[in-house]
Amino acid sequence: MARTKQTARKATAWQAPRKPLATKAARKRASPTGGIKKPHRYKPGTLALREIRKYQKSTQLLLRKLPFQRLVREIAQAISPDLRFQSAAIGALQEASEAYLVQLFEDTNLCAIHARRVTIMPRDMQLARRLRGEGAGEPTLLGNLAL
């Protein structure tokens, strides 16, 4: 058994004796952080790029089906209270909506890059819509609804 350093002190009834100090060799082997391993961290942007590649490869819908369905029904309720939808119709609406949004965000990103930025801003989206001929400032059906 390896020898350890001991300190001389008077033992009292209310104090428990302390553990012996570690030897020099044991102290050298122990890491300064106490042996706790830090979790691996990727460089900023690495995970974002991985996520972009993942979603560009996939063909699945990006929006959840039930929240989208509730939104469609809520908007339709404001127009006509007794509308009913087939599930295929809501699926087609979701496909078209997601295709529109993805294309809009691509155009918005191009507008931000044109302005020598990497962060998209509302003005980029307004410019993208204006260039498409949709009109950024025009009130839409969604803009008139109190959602």
UniProtKB/Swiss-Prot annotation:
UniProt keyword annotations, A-Z: Acetylation, Chromosome, Citrullination, Hydroxylation, Methylation, Nucleus, Phosphoprotein
Residues annotated with Citrulline modification: R3, R9, R18, R27
Chain positions found as N6-lactoyllysine: K10, K19, K24, K28, K57
Residues recorded as bearing N6-glutaryllysine in the entry: K19, K24, K28, K57
N6-butyryllysine modification, residue list: K10, K19, K24
InterPro entries, sorted: Histone-fold, Histone_H2A/H2B/H3, Histone_H3/CENP-A
Listed PROSITE patterns: HISTONE_H3_2
Phosphotyrosine carried by residues: Y42
Modified residues (Symmetric dimethylarginine): R9
N6,N6-dimethyllysine modification, residue list: K5, K10, K28, K37
UniProt tissue specificity: Expressed at low level in some tissues, such as testis and brain.
Modified residues (Phosphoserine): S58, S87
PTM sites of type Allysine: K5
Biased composition annotated in UniProt, kind: Low complexity: 1-16
Family: Belongs to the histone H3 family.
Function: Primate-specific variant histone H3, which constitutes a core component of nucleosomes. Nucleosomes wrap and compact DNA into chromatin, limiting DNA accessibility to the cellular machineries which require DNA as a template. Histones thereby play a central role in transcription regulation, DNA repair, DNA replication and chromosomal stability. DNA accessibility is regulated via a complex set of post-translational modifications of histones, also called histone code, and nucleosome remodeling.
Name this polypeptide is given: Histone H3.X
Organism listed in the record: Homo sapiens
Gene name of this polypeptide: H3Y2
